[in-house]
Amino acid sequence: MERSFSQVTSLCRKLDVPLVIAGDLFDKWNPPPQLIEFVAAQLIQLERVYAIPGQHDLPNHNYELMHKSGYGVLRTAGIITDMHPGVPYKIGDFSFIGFPWGYEITKPHKGSGMPMVAIAHRYIWTEGHTYVGADPRLSVTQSSILKHYTASFFGDNHKGFLWIRGKCSVLNCGGFMRRKSDEKSYQPSVGLLYTDGTVKRHPILTTEDVFHRNPELDKIVPEIDMDEFISEMNRLGDVAINFPEQILRYIDEHSLEPNVKEALQHLLLPF
């Protein structure tokens, strides 16, 4: 983790540019104090850090509870500038607008005359960078609102990609570092926005990463009927993996009575 962070902070200092984070700075809203301290020590090296929260940065995916989170600690300490939803921020030659988790991307007001850049935390996908059964409405090709922005940067989908059509560039940032053995072939990267509006991916070097093999696991895996396993997982969906997460997603995606929503969020707060 430290190697990945140091590459990013070194790159920002070398190019004299700010760092903009498209959400999910942490993988859960209540990270241990040691992790908050580590991230703070990395980001404090930079003069300008802008960010929006992802769902994992927020208790119960609730934007109003941000102050209780590790992300909220960094905001209160002044280590990051939290971008308020829909509010333009002048960063260099561009006007950046943040759309945290739960906020829809809207058409920008172009009164400033500056090129507009969207920073959003929501799932977006393209062919080869998604999962079976992904909502077609979330495909980058269906996001017509993005044509109003010179560039758009997304968090949430851990499979990074750069999609360009005409003068519109869309970067899904992807995972910042490889965390699991099934990501061994994945290339983490960060996005660079150039003054002419073009976007390029800059790789995070992983040559020093080490994946530890478990010989005992190697013996067990061949004995598993993968066809049966995959079939069962497809039947159960993500519910079998993280039930509380699915409840929170249901709350996000459906209109519930305020008292019902509040009760469910209260019950799931320990998770």
Tell where the protein language model's regions lie, with residue ranges.
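Non-catalytic terminal accessory segments
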Residues: 198-200, 207-271
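Active-site neighborhood of phospho(di)ester-bond hydrolases with catalytic His/Asp-centered motifs
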Residues: 19-24, 48-56, 81-85, 117-121, ...
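Cap/insert and terminal regions of metallo-dependent hydrolase folds
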Residues: 1-8, 180, 184-186, 220-233
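A structural signal for the main folded, soluble domain(s) of proteins
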Residues: 6-7, 14, 97, 103-107, ...
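Conserved catalytic scaffold of divalent metal-dependent phosphoesterases
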Residues: 39, 53-143
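Conserved beta-sheet core of the metallophosphoesterase superfamily
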Residues: 132-202
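Core catalytic region of metal-dependent phosphoesterases/phosphodiesterases
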Residues: 1-88
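Short beta->alpha connector loops
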Residues: 32-33, 99-105, 158, 175-178
